[in-house]
Amino acid sequence: MMSASFKCPVSLSGVENICNGDKAIPGINSRTLFTGSSFLQRHHSANKIFFRTCGKKGSCCLFNIRAMAETDSGNGVPQLDISLSPRVAALKPSKTMAITDLATALKQAGVPVIGLAAGEPDFNTPDAVAEAGIKAIQDGYTRYTPNAGTMEIRTAICHKLKEENGLSYTPDQILVSNGAKQCIMAAAVLAVCSPGDEVIIPAPFWVSYTEMARLADATPVIIPTLLSDDFLLNPEVFSSKLNENSRLLILCSPSNPTGSVYPRELLEEIAKIVAKHPKLLVLSDEIYEHIMYPPAKHTSFASLPGMWERTLTVNGFSKAFAMTGWRLGYLAGPKHFVTACGRIQSQSTSGASSISQKAGVAALALGYAGSEAVSTMVKAYRERRDFLVQRLQAMEGVKLPVPQGAFYLFPDFSSYYGTEVEDFGVINGSEALCRFFLEKAQVALVPGDAFGNDDCIRISYAASLDTLRTAINNIEKSLLLLRPAAAASKAS
């Protein structure tokens, strides 16, 4: 096993020859497993791994190389087959994790990077919820629970859905999982999709939706949306994309990454189209439902006429209750589908943590929409949103719709694309712009192409106002380096 890491500009010594395109790492054959940054050439021949040029002097990049090489033993012993499933090859690497890894490397090198890439609250779990988890441990409540979740938490979820969403379910129509992500994977993809089925996904989208579809040998069908429409699905365009293979529509409201909220009137239009297609189901991702800014209001898709039978509603505790590490989510839907999802879960992880389930019950007991514990966090999010919106909308060349929920902004910086910056290179898209901000502004953001829209970048405002103020000041200063170049580019 060979493992090596290269960091630039921390140490360029010994790296330039590897990166300049005419050198290679010897002794590794064509069945090498490797991971790396975007500088790594995906094409590799026997005994060689090539790298693209790392950029001009001073550019930041990180290479992690882990290789397991086959050796010629000469003793006639068959060599180990280390090939992987085609499913792995079909999955795209996470750009969110890539930017996080690069930011971490810079921090370790002493660069004061501000991280605005994470999709999790910066608040602590409410005290009453944390105490319920601690009490569960102290009481010895540390054993397996039923696969679908305890009757206590499923009953509490049914009560929540009835009181807050106008939805009627029984406990056997609820599946509690290790986070909402597992519910989506088990429900939206593996349980209802077959090879050849199509999963309809409006873009921008959460990064995992498309990869989940591919894991089930289904085909993701991406429908772009417009900034001028607040990144909401256009019913006419949606209708034009449907056919006999359309199996699942995924809607996320409030949206990650845009913060857009679907108004009831638009959802009703979409529901009328869905009703015309007997095979089509809807997965409604409502994980951000409590992080809303008036006058926006949340509507559960399953509450619309004729949609209860077609809808799989996914929700959880991570975002509203600042419980990302507790890993607790749930699915609600017709028993036929929920039972199937439970069968898949039973053969993978089984039930969610008993301790987390006790904490989840306590969270739901806080009151309507989490009561003061959640509203206090939402008030802080809104203050941060308003601050960033004001600053970004005042910047030259930046377009930004005002998000109505979640804790993300998705501004359009495409007016700066195509420009070349000295000691950096060309800003040819959102990934390059995020690397530019990381290097020049020391701010970690997520490129929009990871979400299906290369014009934009995602900014998380799950950080203190002081942190956001420093970050936006740094971003604004760094853009001064691009404005002359952008003007020259347009003039030519």
From Swiss-Prot:
> Might you give the EC number(s) for this enzyme?
2.6.1.1
Q: Which UniProt keywords apply?
A: Aminotransferase, Chloroplast, Plastid, Pyridoxal phosphate, Transferase, Transit peptide
* Record-listed N6-(pyridoxal phosphate)lysine modification sites: 319
Instruction: Provide the GO biological process annotations.
Output: amino acid metabolic process; biosynthetic process
Compartments it resides in: Plastid, Chloroplast
The cofactors named for this UniProt entry are:
pyridoxal 5'-phosphate
Residues annotated as transit peptide in the record: 1-66
Among the entry's GO cellular component annotations, what is one?
A: chloroplast
Which Pfam family, an example, fits this chain? Answer: Aminotran_1_2
GO MF terms held by the record: L-aspartate:2-oxoglutarate aminotransferase activity; pyridoxal phosphate binding
Classify the main location. Answer: plastid
Q: Which reaction does it catalyse?
A: L-aspartate + 2-oxoglutarate = oxaloacetate + L-glutamate
Does the record's keyword annotation contain Nucleus? no
Q: Which Gene3D superfamilies match?
A: Aspartate Aminotransferase, domain 1, Type I PLP-dependent aspartate aminotransferase-like (Major domain)
Q: Where does L-aspartate bind?
A: 119, 206, 256, 458
Family under the similarity heading: Belongs to the class-I pyridoxal-phosphate-dependent aminotransferase family.
Miscellaneous section: The orthologous protein in Arabidopsis has an additional glutamate/aspartate-prephenate aminotransferase activity.
Query: What PANTHER family does the database record attribute to this sequence?
Result: ASPARTATE AMINOTRANSFERASE
* Assembly and binders: Homodimer.
Q: What's this chain's function?
A: Prokaryotic-type aspartate aminotransferase. Specific for aspartate and no activity with glutamine, asparagine, alanine, histidine, leucine, methionine, lysine, arginine, tryptophan, tyrosine, phenylalanine or kynurenine.
Name under which the protein is recorded? Aspartate aminotransferase
From what organism does this protein derive? Answer: Pinus pinaster
The gene from which this protein is expressed is: AAT
